UniProtKB/Swiss-Prot annotation:
SMART domains: Tubulin (SM00864)
Gene3D superfamilies: Helix hairpin bin, Tubulin/FtsZ, GTPase domain
Binding-site positions, GTP: A143, G144, G145, T146, G147, S148, G149
TM region positions: none
CDD domains cross-referenced by the UniProt entry: delta_zeta_tubulin-like
Keyword annotations from UniProtKB, A to Z: Cell projection, Cilium biogenesis/degradation, Cytoplasm, Cytoskeleton, GTP-binding, Microtubule, Nucleotide-binding, Nucleus
UniProt GO molecular function: GTP binding; structural constituent of cytoskeleton
Record protein name field: Tubulin delta chain
Amino acid sequence: MSVVTVQLGQCGNQVGYEFFDILCSDLHSKPGHSTKRENDYYQTVCKEQFFHEEECGDLVTRAVLVDMEPKVVSKTLSMAGRSGKWKYDISSQFSQKQGCGNNWANGYCVHGPKHQDIVMDLVRKQVEKCDRLGGFFTIMSMAGGTGSGMGTFLTRCLRDAYPDSLLLNQVIWPYGTGEVIVQNYNSILTLSHLYRSSDALLVHENDIIHKVCSQLMNIKQISFRDVNKVIAHQLGSIFQPVYTSEEALHYCRNPLGELMECLVPHPEYKMLGLRNIPQMSEHSLAYSTFNWNGLLKHLRQMLIANAKMEEGINWHVRPPSQPTAEKTSLRKELQFNTSVANLAILRGKDVQTASLEGFRDPPLYTPWLSPDDAFTLWKTPRAFNKYEKSATLVSNSQFLLKPLDNIVGKAWNMFASKAYVHQYTKFGIDEEEFLETFTTLEQIIASYTNL
């Protein structure tokens, strides 16, 4: 089944480019420990999901590019064309010469409705090229104007136009010390509205990705492109073909459907986070060897202690020996991270020898789901990107409670003093809308806190 990707704003277009580029690099890499037949099928499934193939063999993305300023879209199109491996459909893009000025309300209330018909027509054309539509994957920032405001509006339009299709929003969480003074307003408005329209939100935190670049990749002068490459690698590690059960004879052809079924058992819990191991520079990788037991031991502790990268894991955090009674006090003392559901994706050599029983411990999960329902394993012997062995954990858990509480608190303090509220009311977002937003997010915080 095919996925139509919608790249929204500067951030969405730059991350989208790196995402498609890494998919194509992976397609052309050595099959590693896969048979030729297996590798051929892997390539077929990847192409079917994210590209359509022209008669000449060129791969063209199933994507729509949207930005209110033309510069980034133009650069993205030309970079893809120069890659020689893939390209965008140049007729599947929309840009204007006037941005949203980092104002969510301007994007949501003005530019979104104004350009809705044109953008949705581009989406429709991509949908019509799919033999079977698996759903939509949007890539956007939470804190800006076009990506967040217009992106949120277009997400609502997608939900209205395709009510039976799955909709996954990948959102970039802003730096804690961002340059945009109203980023907290933009972020809470984005989150609360997406929660109504989207089936799930896959969240990447800029601060964490920046640390990965610095501490794990050993990059000295970190650029936005470095950050985007890490995000793209993590996304690729989810979406490239895998076997979704021990008995599976073929690679999964419905990634969004399988993902939602595994991770979103209840519409109150839609926040997904991602942990990837290993992540390191090519220089370090040349001198490193890995075994599955070591990788999975680290990944499990990252989950339990809510460590978002393998550096600096708190090994003192343990699951409670008693169910729910101890969980609250343990969380307060040691930041134990309770999960709704987890999906582990293993790729590479000797993958059949990996044991994941530790991820099925009942204390890791909320009591209203059995571990067999809450934990899912996907795998493939084909290595991904440059790693002989790699593991990804997609988690619906309490991982975002602290950053969410922080961003809501900062936004509330600004709102209580009416700071910058006039910039939103003049475009049509009134104070009542803000209050509804705070109520929605407080409910999400309460739901995850009480797991």
